[in-house]
Every structure is written in C-alpha cells, then in structure tokens.
A protein has these predicted regions:
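C-terminal motif of bacterial Sec signal peptides marking the signal peptidase cleavage site
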Residues: 15-16
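Non-cysteine beta-strand/loop elements that form the S-adenosyl-L-methionine
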Residues: 93, 307-325, 420-431
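Short, conserved catalytic or interaction motifs in soluble domains
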Residues: 19, 62, 538
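Acidic (Asp/Glu)-rich catalytic clusters
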Residues: 273-276, 299-308, 393-395, 416-418
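His/Asp/Glu-enriched, well-ordered alpha-helical/loop segment
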Residues: 360-370, 377-400, 404-405, 410-418, ...
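Divalent metal-binding segments
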Residues: 22-32, 37, 41-296, 302, ...
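Sec-dependent N-terminal signal peptides
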Residues: 4-12
Length: 558
C-alpha cells in the first residue's frame, strides 16, 4: 500500500503512534483507537478496528478479534481521530487542479484576496515572475468573481493591460464559463473586431463598436482555456501534475473526476497514467464533441489502467447561473452587462434534435452520460429529449447524471426520478453565491437553489460536488454548505433543503461510488473493498454543524 502524507503537520501524529516502525513498510496495518466510520447502511456504524492488507480491506470489527487474527500486523493508533472511506468528488475538473494550484490566486475571500479589481491586478503582478510565466507562456489566474468584486463588473482587457502588455494574460472566472484576455492575448488568439461569436458563446465588445473588450463567454472561452493553460515543457508538465495531485490529496480525495475532458486534457491525463505518475484514481467524462473517437479507445473501461479510465460522455446544455448564462424560462432580474431587459440566458445547443442525437448515441453505445444543466429551460430541454430516447432504448441499468441543476423546479425533479437520473447537486452555491442568486432571480427562487432535501425526499439518488477549480476542492466546505446553507452575509438559503451530516458524507462516499459504477470496490469500509481511506482531525457527525468547515484532512491513504 502506498501512503500519501499530505501535510508536514501530521508528522507529530505519526511519530506519536504506538509502533516505532513506519507502517509504510508493512503489508498489513491494523487501525484502532479512533472513530472508524464505515458509511455502510442508513445510520452511522462504527467499528473498533480495521485491517488492510496492501490495497484491500481484510477486516472490520472488534479490536480483540483483529489482534488475534492479525497478530503480525503493524498497529496504527488513531488517537481519537476519525477514519472514513476516501472521498469521491461526484463532479470536478481534475485537469484544472494544477492551474488552480499553480496560477495566481484571484479567488475572493475567504479563499484568497481578490475583492476588487485593484487587488486582482496586484495579485497578477506579484505572480508574474519569469519562472511562473515560463510554465505556460502566459500570465494566468483562476477564480475572479464579478459578483463579489467591489465594482460588480468583469475586468476587461484594459484592466489586464495594466499588468502587462508584453505578455499574454488570461484570467478564468470562478464559474469556469468565462475568461478575460488582455490585448496581447487577444492578438495571439486572433480574436478581433471581425471575429464572429461562436454558436453557444459570446465575445463581449466595447460599447458601440465590434472591438472585443477582452471578456469571452461560454463556447468563445471554454475551448481555448486548456490550450492556453497547458504546460509548455516536460518540467512544467511534472510541476503541474505534482501540484494538482497534491491539492486533491490534501482534501481527502482518493478518486477524482475530470468532468469535461477535451482532447488536450485527456492527453494530459493519459500521459500521467502511462508514465505511472498518478497516485489517485481519475475518471474522465469526454466532451460530446469528441466522444465518438475517444470512447472507442482502450481508456473507456470499467477498471482503471494505471489509475486512469474514461467513464462516459459529458454534455453541456447551458452556462453558469452566477455568471447569468444559465438558460431560464423567466428573465433575470439583473441582466448581465450588454444584455437587454427580458434576458433569459441562452442554450449551448439550441436544437432539440441535436441534443436528442447526442443522447441517442450514448444510449445506443451504452455510454453513461453526464449532463450539465443549470437553468430550468435547459432542464426542460434535457427532459424533452431524454424522454424520446428513453422510450426508444429504455434505461434499465443506466446511471445517467444531472450535473448542477441549480434552478431545477420540483416538477423537473419528478421527471428526473421517472427517467432514473442521478442528481449531482452543487450546494456550495448557497455560501459563495446565495446572496447573489437572490438578487438576480428573487428571494423565493433564490432559496430553492440546490434543492438537496427535496430531491432526496422525492426518491432521487443524489450526490454533491465541488466543481473544482470553480471553487477550491475542499470537500469539508461542501459538507458544511450542504448541512448549513449559510450565505456570505450569514443568511440561511433554504433551511428546509439542509442535509444531515451523515447524508452529506454519503454523497461524497457511497453514493458517489454508485454514481461512478464503483460501489463494489469503494465508498464504504467493508471487507474486500479497496483500502482507500481518509483520516480527519474531527468527526463530522460529532462536531457542531457550523464547525464542519474547520475539519482538517490529516492523511489520505490510497
């Protein structure tokens, strides 16, 4: 078994264990002396001891019995800490973790310090050393949020030109659906006044002209991001892989998802796998536009090859609710810059027939498909087209997934239940953008975002996720938002939609394993399953729910 030690702060814990020999050298390890929470069953179950043999759990039960059967095993005293199944994020973009870990940190507080455009510019300037620029050839940063910036607007190329006119610059919006590029970058990308808006995207313009102002939306932005942010050398590639994996492991991940893999991100992960660089399991969902070729390779498989596999297809039907590109049936109360009154957002794929064809291909080939849909109009389109395909092919044994569903209506949850759809919801929004949602869609609907309790009560299978690098891949904050639903201003966003801490943990362990067809090997602590474990400094079921966000991952074992 390989042990991945995340923080130097845990050295004290390790050296205080009862045995003097490092368990790194032992095949059998007996864990005891803490809360060992199996996550097996509808109510919490604890065991006194757990024994692993290399990468497999071989015993869960009483400490007396464990010591008798496994007398030669090295013992690991947990000293009151909490041992759980390794975390499985139901939706994230692992290929973007390195950029988040390495790039300029332009997230707003509490995650970083970009609370106005001046501070954003300073952070970018401070980051712009020759060594950093050399990694990709660009100055780049991840996570600016116009809804939190004092100016309540997007930065433009004019703002970024204050950082540099010599080097190209790209900053990624916190939603991952927009970017801003400086003048040098626009020229390198050949985006100018004659460049048309792509279908499903928008190049924002300087008012009363066709000149790009630097802001790119949706399909004007998303295809170019991985090209710009890709490492430019073998040394840079190695630095990216180390940074991305260390970030995931530091938050307790043992399985991570690349939730919309383009060819470049698939090649990045394929290279990592083939060079035996991956330490945790990575499952990719390939963008529908290139799925037909990549899902016919050996990487599309039920089991991992060097910790990597393709799990299915990703379809995106609209954009970002906080960025106001999610496709709605009711107008936004505050349209984005340049939009007219009555603005509804817009579809990524306007034609129902085109969407139906994508679903039909997935069903015909027995490919799992994950569908990004945030606005209720996008979910109407999803339901309309899926109904037709399901009538033709059936859905027995399928585990197709709604990703985000931020503005889902109750009647749509009923429809998803009938279509056997798993709902992977995104309650991080309640903290990061709960106040903003209420501004742009109103109090009544704003309190219904990420309706986890309603979905669960209606009998849907649910999971929750980080969507990192949209936010940091901090699964303790995901648990905290799912159980508290408190906004930045301290307001409760939909009290009746709260999950219990145990339900929230289920969403990132057993239920997420089920979503990925991996429930036979992951998600609970049972004999025969993988020894994917995470050690926490406190038990999420025993602390006050407001303190869940402060729990620290001490160790991730894969």
């Amino acid at each position: 078994m390989k042990k991945l030690l995340i923080f130097t702060t845990i050295l004290y814990f390790l050296t205080s264990c009862s045995n003097e020999t490092s368990p790194l050298k032992q095949k059998q390890i007996l864990y005891y002396g803490g809360d060992i929470l199996t996550m097996n069953g509808d109510t919490p179950k604890y065991v006194e001891a757990l024994v692993t043999n290399e990468d497999t759990i071989v015993f869960v039960g009483k400490i007396k019995e464990a010591k008798k059967i496994f007398a030669a095993a090295k013992t690991q005293n947990l000293h009151g800490k909490t041992l759980l199944p390794g975390f499985i994020d139901a939706h994230a973009h692992f290929a973007g973790f390195p950029s988040q870990a390495i790039g300029a940190q332009i997230l707003p507080p509490p995650d970083a310090g970009a609370d106005n455009i001046a501070s954003l510019i300073k952070i970018l300037k401070d980051w712009s050393t020759p060594e950093n620029i050399e990694l990709t050839g660009w100055i780049f940063g991840m996570g600016f949020d116009d809804s939190v910036l004092e100016e309540k607007r997007f930065p433009t190329k004019t703002d970024l030109d204050k950082v540099s006119t010599e080097h190209p610059i790209m900053i990624i919006h916190i939603s991952g659906h927009f970017c801003v590029v400086n003048s040098k970058g626009l020229a390198m990308l050949n985006i100018n006044s004659e460049t048309p808006d792509p279908e499903g995207g928008l190049i924002r313009r300087v008012p009363n002209t066709n000149e790009p102002n630097g802001v790119l939306e949706e399909l004007a932005a998303i295809p170019i991001m991985p090209k710009v942010l890709g490492p430019k050398s073998e040394a840079a590639l190695k630095a990216f892989l180390i940074a991305g994996q260390d970030m995931a492991l530091s938050y307790g991940y043992t399985t991570v998802q690349e939730g919309r893999a383009m060819p470049s991100s698939h090649l990045f992960l394929e290279h990592a796998a083939m060079t035996n660089f991956l330490k945790l399991d990575v499952v990719s969902y390939i963008d529908y536009s290139v799925a037909d070729s990549l899902l016919r390779t050996d990487w599309y498989r039920d089991t991992y090859k060097n910790h990597y596999r393709i799990g299915g297809v990703k379809l995106t039907l609209d954009g970002s609710p906080q960025g106001r590109t999610a496709w709605r049936t009711q107008p936004y109360l505050i349209p984005p810059e340049g939009a007219k009154e009555g603005y509804l957002g817009y579809p990524a794929i306007p034609s129902d027939k085109d969407v139906e064809n994508i679903y039909e291909s997935a069903f015909r080939n027995n490919w799992q498909i994950h569908t990004h849909a945030n606005g209720d109009a996008a979910m109407d389109q999803m339901i309309r087209t899926l109904k037709k395909v399901t009538q033709k092919y059936g859905n027995e044994g399928r585990r197709d997934v709604l990703i985000h569903g931020q503005y889902v209506r109750e009647d749509q949850l009923d429809a998803f239940k009938n279509l056997n759809i798993i709902a992977s919801l995104f309650p991080l929004h309640t903290f990061y953008w709960g106040d903003w949602h209420k501004e742009i869609i109103g109090d009544r609907l704003g309190n219904k975002i990420s309706p986890t309790r309603t979905a669960l009560n209606k009998g849907l299978r649910i999971t929750i996720h980080t969507d990192a690098p949209v936010a940091l891949p901090n699964l303790m904050r995901v648990l905290w938002t799912a159980t508290n639903r408190v906004s930045r201003s301290g307001e409760i966003i939909g009290k009746n939609e709260r999950l219990t801490p145990y339900e929230a943990l289920k969403c990132i362990t057993e239920w997420s394993a089920y979503q990925h067809f991996e429930e036979d090997t992951k998600g609970t602590l049972e004999v025969g399953k993988l020894a994917d474990l995470v050690l926490l400094d406190a038990n999420p079921l025993k602390v006050k729910i407001d303190a869940i966000k402060d729990i620290t991952v001490l160790e991730t074992i894969k």
